[in-house]
From Swiss-Prot:
<dbReference type="InterPro" id="IPR001412">
    <property type="entry name" value="aa-tRNA-synth_I_CS"/>
</dbReference>
<dbReference type="InterPro" id="IPR014729">
    <property type="entry name" value="Rossmann-like_a/b/a_fold"/>
</dbReference>
<feature type="compositionally biased region" description="Basic and acidic residues">
    <location>
        <begin position="309"/>
        <end position="319"/>
    </location>
</feature>
<dbReference type="Pfam" id="PF09334">
    <property type="entry name" value="tRNA-synt_1g"/>
</dbReference>
<feature type="short sequence motif" description="'KMSKS' region">
    <location>
        <begin position="631"/>
        <end position="635"/>
    </location>
</feature>
<keyword id="KW-0648">Protein biosynthesis</keyword>
<dbReference type="GO" id="GO:0002161">
    <property type="term" value="F:aminoacyl-tRNA deacylase activity"/>
</dbReference>
<dbReference type="InterPro" id="IPR009008">
    <property type="entry name" value="Val/Leu/Ile-tRNA-synth_edit"/>
</dbReference>
<dbReference type="Pfam" id="PF13603">
    <property type="entry name" value="tRNA-synt_1_2"/>
</dbReference>
<keyword id="KW-0030">Aminoacyl-tRNA synthetase</keyword>
<dbReference type="InterPro" id="IPR009080">
    <property type="entry name" value="tRNAsynth_Ia_anticodon-bd"/>
</dbReference>
<dbReference type="GO" id="GO:0006429">
    <property type="term" value="P:leucyl-tRNA aminoacylation"/>
</dbReference>
<keyword id="KW-0547">Nucleotide-binding</keyword>
<dbReference type="GO" id="GO:0004823">
    <property type="term" value="F:leucine-tRNA ligase activity"/>
</dbReference>
<comment type="similarity">
    <text>Belongs to the class-I aminoacyl-tRNA synthetase family.</text>
</comment>
<feature type="region of interest" description="Disordered">
    <location>
        <begin position="308"/>
        <end position="327"/>
    </location>
</feature>
<dbReference type="Pfam" id="PF00133">
    <property type="entry name" value="tRNA-synt_1"/>
</dbReference>
Length: 867
């Protein structure tokens, strides 16, 4: 960064009597850009590195208020840390691959890259108007080959480490977007996270990453993330879903050598198993189903194929199932038990089979009663007077009964004992089970990062040599074909020679899940111009982990989990030192706008159609409308265009409102009146600074006025500094600025020149992170050197907070009778002496000594008369 210099036509000389934000903001933005004010500087010896990062946006072309809130929050944090002396990295980029661009390109008959680059240019300009302290020299776009070259390089690195592999799998197929979805991209209703279509199941050969290899590390290391919201850590823990128990093998009668393996967290209940249940699509169902049950099993499986996972496993309906006719042997006692298939067992969870213990599992009990299956109690409640009815299941602790040699053990003791017994006899083993599945990264779409693999009939799947990266996307191909990847139709691109044997071969035509590119972008920002590697270890280790990450809670499982996996995997390959990418995480709340909804039809009405806001009525049926605050969206007619707000009030007002209206983690309700209120506050500051700039230098300063002003200033410094540490209570920090401005407006004129200068310097520096343009203007008009954003954050002076004198109440028999002004550090003995000598004591004690004197230092003296 070059030495900062204000415009040659001094800001003060161009100032007017009115606050005109647009011209002022444009002028300072141009100067900051010209002088590269926010260019990242490597930390000096002893200087802390602070990496502040917002989750980078998809370039839709339009900035919305959710974006504004995210980026302004991060910007304030970056600005404060820079003023506190840290070396700050605050970059921005674009998560630019994905289906929306591909679909838009098909609709407009242009290349997705053209559409995306146009949107990036538009959004970059919109972000620029917010006055963000971003180092644009580090900008990246995941759709540009100089970025996705390194996504491919990292894929090959994971492939070399055995973490990337291909297999045939039953996958989630989106029939609208014509692509495969990861499990995390299918909601609880079985619908695609993006298109909303009901997801179908298909068998395809797909690429996966072994995220399950890191399940324990991903779960256990959540305890280290004390700077993350507890809600996010809980969501990740539940998604990983570690269960500790045992795998148990049940042999199948009449099928020698065939066994069914179940996973259970309750091996202590093994003697109570009265049936087994398989998932309808379990691999053994066809083999085990008898001819007598074939028709009913086939019909049931067809029915299950039409239902979503949520519909199958919902607790709101009875559990459905049919017998296969096959029988298994309980290895613990040799008893024969029937094998069923049921809706609530899923093939891709656990082993796809469960053991039914109706006496000690509520769901199993319901299923057994419904289908008249036997119930055998094997756990007895012990140590309590609690009675378990025959008509209910007991899932709590107790003592084993009816369990052969294990009877009398506590259920915790029995878990280990029965598992060990099974292990000794070859039918059980201790096991950890996870809900987490390997990450499916194949996508049958065009606009994504090509997978750098070549398929050879002789050599199999061969990695593209790294010196041949990037494998670039071809242009000019038909994107509209149904089914399969559009890349498969680019024959000239697909046909290559095998790097291993030189024979004809074909490129992989699937592209990567867009989350592949966003799982490591924070690393590239540390070294964005490196042409030899995705990042240099020295640069990454200098800046990582990200000190403060800001983004929506909707990314709690997908992006944040994948990024943690990537970091751990790359750490294991000695590419970086940190094992966690983000030290602190702030999940900002949504920005909500007023909606008008017809409760009779569910239709949302445009605010423009509502004539009377105090009594909103539907213009069509005349009935009353519900007035709600909901997340801004086009369909609900409640969006607010950031550009329109900036055009009317300026970026500083928009920033101040966003920060003041609600704590960052809470939802924010948009209110035009409050926006206007912030604009008026900035106007008051303008007049305050204008008054100081035009002050004649003469003041009737007194020691008392100076101490009052300094006390107000240093109280504000202390309070704002605390509000901007850890919890980031921007709203209360701005409240403190308002209090300070009120104090200065009423008392500054009576202060000495030195105190006035101290007060205004502190006010402007405290304002700088929130309203950077106006603070810069004020700083220059007040004669400050360099940029205000290069100034040190003010420190409060504890001595300035000490009051010179205080008022102490005098009570007689507990009733207030007067007060006295005393030194703030007045001792208890001195307070008693002064109270007894006061006119109040002379009047109410009538010259008699009190029976008792109660002194509360700093607050009151209570005189208790002798009679």
């Amino acid at each position: 960064m070059t030495a900062f210099s204000s415009p040659s036509s001094n800001a003060a000389s161009s100032a007017t009597d009115r606050y005109q934000p647009l011209a002022l903001e444009e002028r300072w933005q141009a100067l900051w850009k010209e002088q590269r004010l926010y260019e990242t500087q490597d930390p000096k010896p002893g200087q802390r590195a602070f990496y502040a990062l917002s989750m980078f946006p998809y370039p839709s072309g339009t900035l919305h208020m959710g974006h504004v809130r995210n980026y302004v929050i991060t910007d304030v944090i970056a600005r404060v840390q820079r003023m506190r002396g840290d070396a700050v990295l605050h970059p921005m980029g674009w998560d630019a691959f994905g289906l929306p661009a591909e679909n838009a390109a098909i609709e407009r008959k242009i290349e997705p890259g053209v559409w995306t680059d146009s949107n990036i240019a538009q959004m970059r300009g919109q972000l620029g108007r917010l006055g963000l302290s971003i180092d644009w020299d580090r900008e990246v776009a995941t759709c540009h080959s100089d970025y996705y070259r390194w996504t491919q390089w990292l894929f090959l690195e994971l492939h070399a480490g055995g973490l990337a592999y291909q297999k045939d799998a039953t996958v989630n197929w989106d029939p609208v977007d014509q692509t495969v979805l990861a499990n995390e991209q299918v909601d609880a209703d079985g619908r695609s996270w993006r298109s909303g279509a009901l997801v179908e199941k298909r068998d395809l050969r797909q690429w996966f990453l072994r995220i399950t290899d890191y399940a324990d590390a991903l779960l256990d290391d959540l305890d280290q993330l004390q700077g993350w919201p507890e809600r996010v850590r809980t969501m990740q823990a539940n998604w990983i879903g570690r269960s500790i128990g045992a795998e148990i093998d049940f042999q199948v009668e009449a099928h020698p050598g065939t066994s069914i393996t179940v996973f259970t967290t309750r091996p202590d209940t093994l003697f109570g198993v009265s049936y087994l249940v398989l998932a309808p699509d379990h691999a053994l169902v066809d083999q085990l189903t008898t001819s007598e049950e074939r028709i009913s099993v086939t019909a049931f499986r067809d029915l299950m194929a039409e239902l979503s996972q949520d519909e199958r496993t919902s607790d709101d309906q009875p559990k459905r199932g049919v017998p296969t006719g096959a029988v298994a042997i309980n290895p613990a006692n040799g008893k024969s038990i029937p094998i069923w298939i049921a809706d609530y067992v899923l093939a891709d969870y656990g082993t796809g089979a469960v053991m039914g213990v109706p006496a000690h599992d509520v769901r199993d009990f319901s299923f057994a009663r419904q289908h008249e299956l036997p119930v055998q109690r094997v756990i007895e409640v012990s140590g309590t007077n609690e009675h378990v009815n025959d008509g209910e299941a007991w899932a709590g602790p107790g003592t084993l009964i009816h369990s052969a040699g294990f009877s009398g053990l506590s259920n915790d003791e029995a878990k280990t004992a029965i598992t060990n017994h099974g292990a000794e006899n070859g039918w059980a083993r201790a096991k950890r089970q996870y809900r987490l599945r390997d990450w499916l990264i194949s996508r049958q779409r065009y606009w994504g990062c090509p997978i750098p693999i070549i398929h050879c009939d002789d050599c199999g799947a061969v990695p593209v040599p790294r010196d041949q990266l990037p494998v670039e996307l071809p242009t000019g191909i038909d994107l509209k074909g149904a089914g399969g990847s559009p890349l498969a139709r680019a024959e000239d691109w697909v046909s290559v020679t095998c790097p291993k044997c030189g024979k004809p071969a074909r490129r992989e035509t699937d592209t990567m899940d867009t989350f592949m590119c966003s799982s490591w972008y924070y690393l590239r920002f540390a070294d964005p111009h490196n042409r030899d590697l995705p990042f240099n270890a020295t640069s990454v280790n200098r800046w990582l982990p990200v000190k403060q990450y800001v983004g929506g809670i909707e990314h709690a499982i997908l992006h944040l989990l994948y990024a943690r996996f990537f970091t751990k995997a790359l750490n294991d390959r000695d590419l970086l030192q940190t094992k966690e990418p983000f030290e602190r995480l702030l999940t900002q709340g949504m920005v909500q706008g007023t909606t008008y909804r017809n409760p009779r039809t569910g239709r949302y009405i445009s605010p423009a159609a509502v004539k009377d806001e105090s009594n909103p009525l539907d213009p069509d049926d005349g009935g009353p409308l519900e007035v709600l605050f909901e997340k801004m969206s086009k369909s609900k007619h409640n969006g607010v265009d950031p550009a329109a707000v900036i055009d009317r009030y300026g970026a500083d007002t928009a920033r101040m409102f966003i920060l003041f209206k609600a704590p960052p983690e809470k939802d924010l309700e948009w209110d035009d009146a409050d926006v206007e209120g912030q604009f008026r506050f900035l106007q008051r500051l303008w007049r305050l600074v204008d008054s100081e700039v035009n002050h004649d230098g003469v003041s009737p300063a007194t020691g008392e006025s100076d101490s009052d002003i300094r006390r107000a200033v240093h109280q504000a410094i202390k309070a704002v500094s605390e509000d901007l540490s850890d919890d980031f209570q921007f709203n209360t920090a701005i409240s403190e600025l308002m209090k300070l401005s009120n104090s200065l407006s009423s008392g500054l004129a009576q202060a000495s020149p030195g105190v006035r200068q101290e007060a205004m310097s502190a006010l402007v520096r405290l304002l700088a992170p929130f309203a950077p343009h106006l603070a810069e203007e004020f700083w220059q008009r007040l004669g400050g050197e360099d940029s205000v954003h290069c100034q040190p954050w003010p420190d409060h002076d504890p001595e300035a907070l000490v009051l010179a004198s205080i008022e102490v109440v005098i009570q007689v028999k507990g009733k207030v009778r007067g007060s006295m002004s005393v030194a703030a550090d007045c001792s208890k003995e001195e307070l008693e002496r002064l109270a007894l000598a006061s006119d109040v004591a002379q009047r109410w004690l009538e010259g008699k000594p009190p029976r008792r004197v109660i002194v509360v230092p700093g607050k009151l003296v209570n005189l208790v008369p002798s009679s």
